[in-house]
């Protein structure tokens, strides 16, 4: 179902369901022979949610038991898991680097089923603020509580839609705009209209003193090329059909949740506003972590740039 200005969702529908897909990929990677990342809570989330398209990523045995489906989408599922594993590692290393530099205030925007507040070794005194839709945060908190999980930092949940005045909610929850902050906007930008993307980074910039850090992933140049869009749409249709045959559930069209609009280049914008920013392509990131780079542009993941930035002292 296409997006609307005031849409909302639970964890198993619309944008919320994409968080389960990411968690499923993290679960599969964690349980693989040589995992790049370790997320002990990813499987907990997936099991609590029940069956859905995410089952195809979280349970490789499903594909192994259906050779005709595995032959159609098995390689693409592996590509998605590799992408999510490297994406997770990128943001993990970003946060650990910021912590090593002395940052003790962290904001995870559109946190979804991000479990870093529970699994990363945060230094004493670290406060992690998580912002997302109320029902998404409720699902995550309840699921982790039922499994006896304890945060490894002071955790502040802020249930809010990022299209609303989230800076005010953040400040009301104790956020200190005078302290350096590590910000992440992981897997978020594609789900925002172009103007909302601009506003997001304007707000982050306003709340970030010298010493702050920022990481995000954004669409790569050329992502609106009509041939590329058509091929990726066809590939996603094949994957949805395969998942539907495996779990007998109608799958949402994830690409309908994205806003296909021309966007401000984030790394350039940050550089113009006093940040030192660098960008890495998804292909470069896969190579860095020793994962194969797909030899075509028809995979399930559109071309992506990973941006990291630091605001130095004036």
From Swiss-Prot:
InterPro entries: Ppm1/Ppm2/Tcmp, SAM-dependent_MTases_sf, SAM_mthyl_Trfase_ML2640-like
One GO biological process term: methylation
Keyword Cell inner membrane listed: no
Region entry Disordered, spans: 291-314
GO molecular function, one term: methyltransferase activity
Keywords: Methyltransferase, S-adenosyl-L-methionine, Transferase
E.C. designation(s): 2.1.1.-
Domain of life: Bacteria
Binding positions for S-adenosyl-L-methionine per the UniProt entry: 132, 161-162
Role, per record: Exhibits S-adenosyl-L-methionine-dependent methyltransferase activity.
Cited NCBIfam families: mthyl_TIGR00027 (TIGR00027)
Sequence similarity: Belongs to the UPF0677 family.
Name of the protein this chain belongs to: Putative S-adenosyl-L-methionine-dependent methyltransferase MUL_4402
């Amino acid at each position: 179902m296409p997006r609307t200005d005031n849409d909302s969702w639970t964890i198993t529908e619309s944008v919320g369901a994409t968080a389960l897909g990411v968690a499923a990929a993290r679960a599969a990677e964690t349980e693989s022979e040589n995992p790049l990342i370790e997320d002990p809570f990813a499987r907990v989330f997936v099991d609590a949610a029940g069956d859905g398209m995410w089952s195809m990523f979280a349970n490789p045995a499903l594909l192994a038991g259906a050779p005709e489906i595995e032959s159609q989408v098995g390689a693409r599922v592996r590509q998605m898991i590799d992408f999510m594993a490297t994406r997770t590692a990128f943001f993990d290393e970003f946060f650990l680097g910021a912590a090593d530099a002395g940052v003790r205030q962290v904001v995870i925007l559109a946190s979804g089923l991000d479990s870093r507040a529970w699994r990363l070794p945060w230094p004493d005194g670290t406060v992690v603020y998580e912002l997302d839709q109320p029902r998404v945060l409720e699902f995550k908190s309840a699921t982790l509580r039922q499994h006896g999980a304890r945060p490894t930092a002071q955790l502040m949940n802020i249930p809010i839609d990022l299209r609303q005045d989230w800076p005010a909610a953040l400040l009301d929850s104790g956020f200190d705009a005078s302290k350096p902050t590590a910000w992440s906007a992981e897997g978020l930008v594609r789900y925002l209209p172009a103007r909302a993307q601009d506003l997001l980074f304007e707000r982050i910039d306003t709340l970030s003193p010298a010493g702050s850090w920022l990481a995000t992933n954004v669409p790569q140049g050329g992502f609106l090329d009509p041939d590329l869009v058509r091929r990726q749409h066809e590939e996603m249709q094949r994957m949805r059909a395969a998942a539907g045959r495996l779990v007998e559930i109608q799958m949402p069209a994830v690409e309908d949740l994205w806003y296909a609009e021309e966007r401000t280049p984030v790394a350039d914008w940050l550089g113009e506003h006093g940040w030192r920013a660098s960008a890495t392509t998804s292909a470069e990131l896969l190579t860095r972590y020793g994962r194969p780079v797909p030899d075509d542009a028809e995979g399930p993941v559109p071309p992506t740039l990973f941006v990291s930035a630091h605001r130095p002292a004036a």
